[in-house]
Amino acid sequence: MADACDYARYCSSIDFWAITDHAEASTPRKWQETKDSIRQCSFKNGKETNDVIPFVGFEWTQVGPTPEEHYGHKNVIFKDLEESKLSKRPIGAGGTATNALRNNTGGLMPPIVGILDILNFQDYSDFNYFINEVRDIPTCPKNKSSADLSSDCYEFADTPGDLVRRLEEQNLDPLIIPHGSTWGFYTPPSSSWDKQLKSDMRPEKMKIIEVMSGHGNAEEFRSYQQIIGDLNNPVCSKPTSEFLPSCWRAGQIIENRCLQEGLSKD
């Protein structure tokens, strides 16, 4: 994390940055080290400075298997660095991400793998240490207020509304930024923002949204859809003057190849 601070200050010359590691993979030790490192980053040569402003945060990394269950990822960023104004613990997302890291009976590298690849043995050993540390943290009771939970347990929220509620129970009002909403590895096709605009999902707490990243972009709302119909039996949308669905374009490419091979359109 010190490298990230130095890069922000001396290389990229950005005005501010935030650490937002995945909450599902965090532990009490990592969270404390994160807070300590960010506080140290706010100092230069032993004096507090504002040449670059670092923020403490975490990522709520929700993955749903269907569009109805998928809410996506949220970066949670806190304005202040004082202990009382930070979450007692990162709050992870229930479901796929938590189950994969914490509840999966597999996941550890068998010792034989490190032996067979002896030059990289330390990497395998470090991975197993990482997984074991995560899984050794007990899950917080779900029926207690977030403010009353121990700082050494793992807390998770199933929905954006639940996430906001738990933060409010600690009297916290951080910046929450939805991001990574493009279809692909963790976002089921036909997913949309519709269900997240309902009042119980607390959309008023998410005042800005990521519009571009390495995952893709979500810069503007458009009324058309890539696919229509049931997810198990999807139908490609027809093109419009403003939009050519990728599935339709794929069909055009296949058709052209068939015609070049002398096949008929039928």
Give residue ranges: language-model regions.
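Extended, charged catalytic domains and RNA/DNA-binding interfaces, predominantly
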Residues: 1-266
